[in-house]
Amino acid sequence: MARIAGVNIPTAKRVVIALQYIHGIGPKKAEEITEKVGIPAERRVNQLTDAEVLQIREAIDRDYIVEGDLRREVSMNIKRLMDLGCYRGLRHRKQLPVRGQRTHTNARTRKGKAKPIAGKKK
């Protein structure tokens, strides 16, 4: 198994698919990386040489924010919004939907499991 950006990527899959196992790399970025390095799209990870794996690793480290750094940056952005006290920050703090969705009904994913109200009978 090749280890890129701290992630063991599967060896039997094509390089473009295997790179998507890294947090922060989707289909577009995976294709960009393989084109930069000059690896054919149909090549599988177990067919890569050590030099090619090193080139991929260097390209990712140089050009992209991935894995822990990306997660840290996203959480810092959310924390900054909450510290500012802006509307989006308040919605994050209250664990409600941030992007204008209705909350009277629905929004169960963000709000969590429904809490029963004591004494309410039908």
From Swiss-Prot:
Keywords: Ribonucleoprotein, Ribosomal protein, RNA-binding, rRNA-binding, tRNA-binding. InterPro entries: Rbsml_uS13_C, Ribosomal_uS13, Ribosomal_uS13-like_H2TH, Ribosomal_uS13_bac-type. It comes from the Bacteria. GO terms for cellular component: cytosol; small ribosomal subunit. Pfam families: Ribosomal_S13. GO terms for biological process: translation. The keyword Ribosomal protein applies. Residues 94-122 are annotated as: Disordered. Part of the 30S ribosomal subunit. Forms a loose heterodimer with protein S19. Forms two bridges to the 50S subunit in the 70S ribosome. Belongs to the universal ribosomal protein uS13 family. Located at the top of the head of the 30S subunit, it contacts several helices of the 16S rRNA. In the 70S ribosome it contacts the 23S rRNA (bridge B1a) and protein L5 of the 50S subunit (bridge B1b), connecting the 2 subunits; these bridges are implicated in subunit movement. Contacts the tRNAs in the A and P-sites. This is Small ribosomal subunit protein uS13. It comes from Methylorubrum extorquens (strain PA1).
